[in-house]
Amino acid sequence: MAVYVADPALDVRQHEYEMVWVIQPEASEERIEDLKSRISQVIQREGGHISTIDVWGKRTLAYPIKKYFEGYYLLYHFEMDPEGTDELERLIRFTEDIIRHLVIRLDE
């Protein structure tokens, strides 16, 4: 379901997204919190709103990814302008601690 902003000055169409990302298993709690903060800041800076953050914790991977057999999983539900996802993807791609991610648009 698309959400329309009521303020005409901010007349952008926002979409609902779900993002799962997997962090290297040996990442410290401080590093995980730092990554969560950076991702959240990008979403908010791009005009988005985070609905929920679910921490799934450390889980065994179905197959090795970058020589890792486990990963620390997080799930985000958020709304944001489609053009803002480019900046989010850029941040995730250039963060070495994130070994896998998937962003899915939920509406439609």
Where is each model-derived feature located?
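Structured, basic alpha/beta domains of bacterial-type, RNA-associated proteins
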Residues: 2-108
